UniProtKB/Swiss-Prot annotation:
GO MF annotation terms: guanyl-nucleotide exchange factor activity
Source organism (scientific name): Dictyostelium discoideum (Social amoeba)
GO biological process: Ras protein signal transduction; response to differentiation-inducing factor 1
Protein name: Ras guanine nucleotide exchange factor N
Biased composition (Gly residues): 283-299
Cross-referenced CDD domains: REM
A GO CC term attached to the entry: plasma membrane
Function: Promotes the exchange of Ras-bound GDP by GTP. May play a role in chemotaxis.
């Protein structure tokens, strides 16, 4: 609904219960336009209200759980009651004085242009129309072309022109005067064209205080960049309206409502402002120069003075920054063109103590180098909602997902960090500040030249886990542009050795004070490297230079589901469902089904006419919609029997449905039908007029409604006769059979009124746990011989056929002979029937043929599965002379494919009977043992590859490789191999490698490792089962989660209640596990096996548990001079205390 000039939102929009995204950009909606209605919509996820007329955030929005909310910068409100301000009036031509006639016409044209231009937002309109004082008196004609510097007298005016935002041709940078002497705190800002912009005051902030703009994030509100700025600290790097990061020299147009742009940019355009630090005496908010009039435009001499002052300020900032890093402030400027300087106001800075810098190493700075000011917040109590300058979420957007920090910078040191995916020369300078620790003291020692930090905390890996971090105390990044000409450094002197404290090498610009690893910056290539630190114990070398170059890069191969799957964007759930935000839960699905059934069960007055019932009631439309989906087991397309008295028209509607007509004609229906539709000799249904008043509960007459699913169970609950041998319950509004006798269960499975596919599935999967085949045959025979109509007999034969097809592996030879004897008795009974004998005999002959083909092995259940697309070509090429296969040379997705093929072959060998035996008796059948041994072998192989890597660099690369393999297995829905790989990384022998894990915790690989490790925790096994149940086949489940759950179900629930009732709730839970594994067995993967790789994955050398622990201990002894200290702020390499 964007760009529609909407002025109001109707309250009826809240009736859209499944609305997730609303786009209302560029409309005319205000706070009283009904926007607050969106606060009552719980399903809303995305809302765009940019370029509207909102003046404040509606209070109802705080309750929404939005993933995206786009708003304009809020229009600030005055805290105090402001006086009525006079509007600017057009000058009137007086007949007595016509000397200013030309000027008056020009001003009138300006007013017309100003009135014709529609404001982009209320904020711009406020900036245009607000005035703090009365309008100036009309000047004379002489004042228009005056060059006098006295611009605030009554003889001069400020020209009223069109807002520069609407001036698309304006390219020159604006000149803002930042006078330091005799400036009022509440002075207005005057742009280069003379437009007076009054100072903005917020609702909860006193006049003259610090001004902020606010931006809404996904979960909370965090303050954005400073709203009003006369410096260039936020012109070098700022946020646009979409939350991205742009440079000021970009050619793209800037949104006028961009959050984080300075107020000077909002008025004058996107060019960086040039600060004029003249010491002129200005008052009343005016700004200007002695050689300028109207606050802008000036002579060349004034502009040259401005450039000189800007260079002087830039030099001072360089010196300050140089002292912070522990170096001298001597710098040489090679160029002085286009150098914006940094204003020392209005940002307060923290106290920085700089004693002595290293003067032995001169540093050259290029004049073209742009330096941004390091901003520190002032101490004080700050509301956590408005505490940091930048939240971790905004930093994530600014860095454009390039958030990898290879090594944690030390506390208090401004360390250039190379960002992942950046090109040469793309560096940022990070300063870690804290909102809680107000004063930061950076001091230096004469001997060590090493800065130390007091009361300073930071978090190095916050970008990887920004969802779980708060805005308080989060680090803030500011860009420090690097000059095009690298400075020249003299040859470094020998490093200073000290046993107590590490020294700073003369060639190094930065040092980590908390570790022996010394970080250096190579200015010639503009890349960050790390020098090699040696220890005095055992001469062990920790090559941090190689470690710094190691980085985790995702390597997940896509397919038709998703062409470019990435864990960093989708996480584990997104890899399984790339096209869905989330899967509907079972509870939500059950509620939808219950609501649809409840609508169908609406009571209709028995005295109402048929025409009114079918034309006006929602029953007809609901029943017709569900009847079209009668082939789906999730929808039962018929109403309950107890809901209608007059059913003639409804019966006609049901009979007109193809699925219902098949049922009444003896055809195949859902859940197993017979071949009676081929003969068509079944007794026709009685006329509708004859069955209008017939009770549905009478089993001796032909029923006119066939119920399925939940409606069938719900109808049984209303029958007083059936309730004698059955107990019902309800789960989330869905009716369930709780306890039942075997005789009643047989009756329900062959009931003439309907069927429940769920009840049939429970029986076929778990009947061997509570009964036996001979006992079931006995009850079926009794049901067939005592049936009062041919429909019951037909249902018995249909159920027997389905039983043989699904559970043929359960039948032994004696069971087959018993079944044939039962069918022979049924044949004799059919011969005695007068009607329907031919149809029943045909169904019986079909069942006998199926049994004979099953015994001979000639029965074909279904055709061989075919795929629409060919299998992907294996991504593996073996060289002719290469005998051995190296793990690091293989692609992760191809290893995952071969692991999936191996696991699926072993999974298909497990039978249903073996699953039941394991759940009841914990019997280890050969098929289950093979799956278990394969899982344990994969765990040992991964652990062996990690431990046998000789250096820490190789161990890190090996872990990165296995993380990518696990992610590819997860994407292929091979949960078994993915869990095995992560279980190997959780072994105690692997977790002993503290140096290795200390580095990995600060890389992108840590996020998927931790998320996978959480799934294998005992408390999260239920969550893993829910994920496996929600995916579609093909998939390979982690059987450990299913088997442990089945054992707990069997041990914690009784099989027989009150000595005769079968506990159907227990077997319902058991049946769900069996069905999940069965579905995974039936669906195959469309992959190509590679014999060489499969042999490599099955015959590789592995170490035992004892050998793994021994090798890991040796690695720890070699690296005993270093330990890893893990805190909530990251991992830091420290020297072990003796």
């Amino acid at each position: 609904m964007s760009y529609n000039s909407l002025t109001t939102i109707d309250i009826d929009i809240t009736q859209l219960l499944h609305l997730k995204s609303v786009n209302l950009r560029s409309n005319k909606l205000g706070n009283s336009s009904g926007v607050s209605y969106f606060g009552s919509m719980d399903t809303l996820q995305k809302l765009n209200l940019k370029e509207n007329y909102l003046t404040e955030l509606p209070s109802t929005f705080y309750l929404l759980k939005l993933s995206s909310l786009k708003l304009d910068t809020f229009t600030p409100l005055y805290q105090q009651q402001q006086q009525q301000q006079n509007q600017l009036q057009r000058p009137i031509i007086n007949s007595q004085s016509t000397s200013n006639e030309s000027l008056i016409h020009e001003i009138n044209r300006s007013f017309e242009n100003l009135s014709m231009s529609e404001p982009v937002s209320p904020r711009i309109a406020a900036l245009k129309n607000e005035k703090k004082g009365p309008p100036k008196p009309l000047p004379k004609t002489k004042g228009l072309h005056s060059s006098s510097s006295n611009i605030n007298t009554s003889n001069n005016i400020t020209p009223i022109l069109m807002s520069p935002i609407h001036d698309g041709n304006k390219k020159s940078p604006s000149i803002i005067s930042n006078n330091n002497n005799n400036n009022n705190s509440n002075s207005n800002i005057i742009t280069s064209n003379g437009t007076v912009i009054p100072q903005l005051v917020f609702k909860n902030e006193p006049t003259g205080g610090r001004l902020r703009s606010f931006t809404l994030d996904a979960d909370h509100i965090s303050p954005g960049r400073e709203l009003v700025s006369t410096g260039s600290s936020d012109e070098i790097l700022y946020f646009n309206s979409e939350g991205g990061c742009e440079n000021s020299d970009s050619d793209e147009p800037i949104q006028p409502l961009s959050a984080g742009r300075s107020r000077a940019q909002t008025i004058s355009g996107k060019q960086p402002s040039i600060i004029n630090n003249n010491n002129n005496n200005n008052s009343g908010g005016g700004s200007g120069n002695n050689n300028n009039s109207g606050g802008g435009g000036g002579s060349r001499k004034a502009f040259q003075n401005l450039i000189k002052s800007a260079k002087q300020i830039g030099s001072n900032i360089k010196n300050k920054t140089h002292h912070i890093n522990g170096h001298s402030s001597s710098s040489q400027s090679n160029s002085t063109t286009n150098t914006p300087s940094i204003s020392s106001t209005p940002y307060p800075t923290s106290t920085i103590k700089t004693n002595v810098s290293d003067t032995n190493t001169p540093v050259n700075y290029n004049g073209q180098q742009q330096i941004s000011k390091v901003i520190q917040r002032v101490s004080g109590e700050i509301d956590p909602l408005y505490s940091g300058i930048d939240s971790p979420r905004t930093l994530e957007r600014r860095n454009s997902s390039r958030d990898d920090i290879p090594i944690s910078p030390p506390q208090g040191c401004m360390t250039p960090i190379k960002r992942l995916g950046s090109v040469e020369g793309d560096e940022i300078s990070a300063i870690f500040s804290s909102s809680t620790d107000a004063n930061m003291d950076v001091s230096q020692d004469y001997s060590s030249s090493t800065p130390t930090v007091n009361s300073m905390s930071y978090q190095s890996s916050f970008l990887d886990t920004f969802d779980n971090q708060s805005t308080v105390g989060s680090p803030t990044f500011y860009q420090l542009p690097v000059s095009s000409q690298p400075p020249q450094h003299p040859p470094p002197p020998p490093p200073i050795k000290d046993n107590n404290q590490p020294k700073l090498n003369q060639s190094q610009n930065l040092i980590n004070t908390n570790s022996n690893s010394v970080t250096t910056t190579n200015n010639s290539s503009q890349t960050t490297t790390t020098t090699t630190t040696t220890t005095t114990n055992n001469n062990n070398v920790l090559n941090l230079e190689k470690l710094h170059k190691l980085d985790f890069a995702e390597d997940i191969n896509g397919d038709e589901r998703c062409s470019n799957p990435l864990y960093s964007k989708k996480k584990l759930a997104g890899l399984l469902f790339p096209n869905k935000h989330h899967q509907p839960s079972a509870l939500k699905t059950a509620k939808i089904r219950f609501k649809s059934s409840k609508r169908l069960a609406t009571t209709v007055n028995s005295n109402s006419s048929n025409n009114l019932m079918m034309s006006n009631s929602p029953l007809s439309s609901s029943s017709m919609n569900l009847l079209q989906q009668s082939n789906s087991p999730q929808y039962s397309g018929t109403p309950t029997s107890g809901s209608f008295q007059n059913q003639s028209v409804l019966s006609a509607t049901l009979m007109s449905s193809p699925s219902m007509s098949d049922v009444f004609s003896g055809g195949n229906s859902q859940g197993g039908g017979s071949s009676l539709s081929q003969s068509g000799s079944i007794t026709p249904v009685a006329p509708l007029s004859a069955v209008q008043g017939s009770p549905i509960g009478n089993s001796g007459s032909v029923n006119n409604i066939y119920l399925e699913g939940d409606d069938f169970i719900r109808d049984l609950m209303q029958s007083p006769i059936i309730n004698q041998e059955i107990e019902f319950t309800s789960e989330d509004g869905v009716p369930k059979v709780k306890n039942i006798t075997l005789k009643m269960l047989t009756s329900l499975l062959t009931h003439e009124k309907g069927q429940s596919n769920e009840l049939n599935g429970i029986f076929f999967d778990t009947y061997l746990l509570f009964t036996s085949i001979p006992l079931v045959i006995e009850h079926l025979e009794s049901r067939f011989l005592n049936g009062k109509n041919h429909i019951v007999k037909q249902k018995v034969i249909t159920f027997s056929q389905k039983w043989v097809e699904v559970c043929w592996s359960d039948f032994k030879e004696e069971h087959i002979e018993l079944l044939l004897k039962f069918l022979n008795d049924c044949s004799e009974q059919i011969e005695k029937l007068v009607t329907g004998s031919f149809a029943l005999r045909t169904s019986l002959n079909l069942l006998l043929n199926i049994i004979n083909m099953k015994r001979d092995g000639t029965y074909i259940t279904e055709e061989e599965e075919t795929f629409e697309q060919p299998a992907p070509i294996p991504d593996f090429i073996q060289l002719p002379n290469c005998v051995d296969i190296n793990l690091m040379d293989l692609r992760p997705h191809e290893i995952a494919r071969q692991l999936t093929i191996l696991d699926h072959e072993l999974l298909t060998q497990i039978t249903k009977q073996q699953m039941l035996d394991y759940a009841v008796h914990q019997t280890n059948s050969p098929s289950i043992v093979k799956v278990t041994d394969r899982f344990n072998y994969l765990v040992l192989w991964v652990s062996t590859e990690i431990v046998l890597s000789l250096t820490i660099e190789k161990r890190i690369e090996t872990i990165f490789k296995f993380v990518n393999i696990a992610l590819n297995c997860w994407y292929l829905k091979n949960f078994n191999s993915a869990i095995a790989i992560i279980a190997a990384m959780s072994k105690p022998s692997i977790e002993k490698l503290k140096q290795t894990w200390g580095f990995i915790r600060n890389t992108k690989a840590n996020a998927p490792i931790q998320e996978l490790k959480e799934l294998i925790l005992p408390t999260n096994v239920a969550r893993l089962r829910k994920i496996m149940d929600s995916v579609e086949a093909p998939f390979i489940p982690y059987l450990g989660a299913y088997f442990s759950h089945s054992i707990a179900i069997h041990a914690g629930n009784k099989s027989i209640v009150n000595e005769q009732y079968i506990n159907m709730q227990k077997y319902d839970m058991m049946g769900k596990i069996i069905r999940s594994i069965t579905v995974a067995q039936e669906k195959k993967y469309n992959l190509t096996p590679v014999g060489v790789l499969q042999k490599f994955l099955t015959d590789s050398f592995v170490l035992t548990e004892k050998q793994l622990y021994s090798e890991a201990s040796k690695i720890e002894e070699k690296g005993d001079s270093y330990i890893t200290e893990t805190t909530k702020f990251g991992s830091i390499f420290k020297k072990k205390d003796k």
